[in-house]
């Protein structure tokens, strides 16, 4: 019997080269790029009240349904510490009513006509 020709080996080689071209290998995956983080604009809030802002505080803030230092700071463009002190002043004059005080967060609401000023 003559030796058989190795038909399997010759058939395998072309397939290997084709597989490399198709799948481009299962080695390293493409490296993920770092995303550019979101950039916030710097807040330039007032440190002291000027006349128009102070009048706005007395006119508009007592009409808000939910009053917190953060809300006042954002709407009137004043610092948080200034907003805190302003709300204490409004509460003492009876224009707003304190609802909750928990650690650093204080929540006020508008004073209704039937309420007595809270001391």
Curated annotation (Swiss-Prot):
The keyword Ribosomal protein applies. GO terms for cellular component: ribonucleoprotein complex; ribosome. Keywords: Ribonucleoprotein, Ribosomal protein. The keyword Membrane does not apply. Residues 1-42 are annotated as: Disordered. Residues 28-37 have a biased composition (Basic residues). It comes from the Eukaryota. Disulfide bonds: none annotated. InterPro entries: Ribosomal_eS25 (IPR004977). Belongs to the eukaryotic ribosomal protein eS25 family. This is Small ribosomal subunit protein eS25. It comes from Spodoptera frugiperda (Fall armyworm). The lineage of its organism: Eukaryota, Metazoa, Ecdysozoa, Arthropoda, Hexapoda. The gene is RpS25.
């Amino acid at each position: 019997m003559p030796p058989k020709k190795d038909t399997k080996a010759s058939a395998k080689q072309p397939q290997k080269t084709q597989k490399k071209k198709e799948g481009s290998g299962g080695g390293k995956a493409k490296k993920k790029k770092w995303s550019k983080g979101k950039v916030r604009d710097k807040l330039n809030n007032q440190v002291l009240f000027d006349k128009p802002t102070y009048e706005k505080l007395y006119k508009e803030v007592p009409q808000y349904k939910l009053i917190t230092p953060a809300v006042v700071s954002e709407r009137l463009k004043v610092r948080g510490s200034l907003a805190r002190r302003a709300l204490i002043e409004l509460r003492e004059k009876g224009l707003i009513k304190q609802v909750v005080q928990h650690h650093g967060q204080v929540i006020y609401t508008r004073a209704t006509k039937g309420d007595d000023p809270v001391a």
